[in-house]
C-alpha cells in the first residue's frame, strides 16, 4: 500500500477529484493548508512593517494498493493538466500497515461483570 499526498491550488481540486472518480480511485481526504516559503514569499505590510504572506493550498491524502499507484498518479496529473495552469506537489510514501479504527459490532468485545 502507498499513501499519496498532493498539495495543489484550490482551483485544481475539482479537476483532480473528477479524474480520480473516473479512474475509480478513492476515497480521499482534503485539508486546507497554508504554505510559508521565506525564500519566495509574497510580501504584505501592516502599518508599514513588511511580513510574509502564506499561500493558500489544498492537501489531498489517499491510501491506495500497490497496483493503483501509477493510475492514481496519472489521474492526478490529468486532473491538474485539464485545468491548464495547475501546479502541484506529489509525495508517495510506502505504507507498511493500516487499520480501521471505527468500531464495528462484529469486533466489539463483551464486557464481563
Label every model-predicted segment:
Residues 1-113:
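Positively charged, small/polar-rich N-terminal and surface patches that mediate targeting and assembly
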Amino acid at each position: 500500500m502507498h499513501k499519496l499526498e498532493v498539495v495543489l491550488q484550490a482551483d485544481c481540486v475539482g479537476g483532480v477529484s473528477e479524474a480520480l472518480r473516473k479512474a475509480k480511485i478513492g476515497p480521499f481526504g482534503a485539508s486546507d493548508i497554508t504554505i510559508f516559503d521565506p525564500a519566495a514569499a509574497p510580501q504584505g505590510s501592516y502599518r508599514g512593517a513588511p511580513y510574509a504572506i502564506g499561500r493558500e493550498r489544498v492537501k489531498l491524502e489517499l491510501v491506495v494498493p500497490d497496483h493503483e499507484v501509477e493510475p492514481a498518479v496519472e489521474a492526478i496529473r490529468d486532473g491538474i493538466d485539464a485545468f491548464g495552469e495547475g501546479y502541484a506537489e506529489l509525495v508517495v510514501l510506502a505504507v507498511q500497515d493500516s487499520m480501521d479504527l471505527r468500531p464495528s459490532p462484529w469486533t466489539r468485545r463483551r464486557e464481563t461483570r
